[in-house]
UniProtKB/Swiss-Prot annotation:
Pfam families cross-referenced by the UniProt entry: ATP-synt_ab, ATP-synt_ab_C, ATP-synt_ab_N
Main location: membrane
Top-level taxonomy: Bacteria, Pseudomonadati, Pseudomonadota, Betaproteobacteria, Burkholderiales
Identification of the protein by name: ATP synthase subunit alpha 1
Function: Produces ATP from ADP in the presence of a proton gradient across the membrane. The alpha chain is a regulatory subunit.
HAMAP family in the record: ATP_synth_alpha_bact
Amino acid sequence: MQLNPAEISELIKSRIEGLTAGANIRNQGTVVSVTDGIVRIHGLSDVMQGEMLEFPADAEGQPSYGLALNLERDSVGAVILGAYEHISEGNTVKCTGRILEVPVGPELKGRVVNALGQPIDGKGPIDAKMTDVIEKVAPGVIARQSVSQPMQTGLKSIDSMVPVGRGQRELIIGDRQTGKTAVAIDAIINQKGQNMTCVYVAIGQKASSVKNVVRSLEQAGAMEYTIVVAATASESAAMQYVAAYSGCTMGEYFRDRGEDALIVYDDLSKQAVAYRQVSLLLRRPPGREAYPGDVFYLHSRLLERAARVNEKYVEDFTKGAVKGKTGSLTALPIIETQAGDVSAFVPTNVISITDGQIFLETSLFNAGIRPAINAGISVSRVGGAAQTKLIKNLSGGIRTDLAQYRELAAFAQFASDLDEATRKQLERGARVTELLKQAQYSPLPISLMGATLFAVNKGYLDDIAVNKLLSFEHGLHGYLKDKHAALLAKLEADKAMDKDAEAELNAATAAFKKSFA
């Protein structure tokens, strides 16, 4: 049999002309069951862990997305992000080939978004130029730089006793209604003018509470540099679980470009509960307190992303666009304890991951000592290196004074006659405790904080009644702002006190004390 070359070319031409190129065939599957926001899907063979899955659109035509979490032999377990009432057995599910992403960038500042980065504040769409994946590997050891710059919270008790540095993870832990959120909000308000972008992640809170926080930030002028990510109690467990990672990615955008960012997770106890719910519905085996086995990894992979990265990392990331700058992401995770039990599963996990903790106690809060910080067991493991010279030199003995005062106060209840040294220690402790009280939404600059600590150390307050100390402090601050503005500006700029500044502050405090009645 002979082949004619002309026939072969004709055959090839006809084949090419008759070819119909359709759309790319995407991996598709079928919904087997839908229960409590968990969907079992059959037929997805090429799906990735954490991949976004596309479900049928809802009644308004909005596409629904889910997250593939369980990859089993003959089915895939996925959680629906958002409403799932319109999804039924037999629906078609498509792979997107993308890991879950959220919008990032400066366009998000001043806005309130949900866990997927969609605006929920009624101010119109967000014109974000970029998106980024929510799950990322934390910077390695070589990419990091040690914490050496302060992150001022504006709270006397924290900045003097448990200082926080840029790139640190400092846990705020305490029972309900002890002022945990108030401490974090004050820290955000104090970042005004400090070139710090703040991200506030509200997990499992009442919508009214989130609204109050946003209102407080707006009144303080802090919303212009803050992004609020809200997954309220009315939203699905999947959204509450995802929200923290979304917020972290938004904060990392600034860290990786040589800027500083602060992120508050309020609170991680509720995130762990949401993750437990999702895991149990996916039929993963429960462990201690019914949490899944990877609940430690849930928080460690999140909090390890808060770091201070070195100049080379920033330069490599921006491909040379930003040179000679380090970036940082500081985390203030919040954990709620039950009746002060810090030995529960989630609190111990987060304490072991973070670089220190601020303990807030109900008894102190009820006694009117606010912020209700327990000085004895609150620590900052790396913040000491970041503390400003001014505060470091002036606050040396305060922590010891307070710890000894609490110990002695317990004994003094039983002793009728006390020796002179003990009495003096008790009086000093009472004065220091009174002076560390601070009203909410009124963080102090370091110059005024330094003036207060200076007055304590030099004994100017020893003969003033304890109940008049806060009015003395308020008056002193007003006097210094009025008559010694240059001195305050110098202290603020230098962040240290030389001999001349000390002499001027000494004279100013003495002069004010004479006029104080």
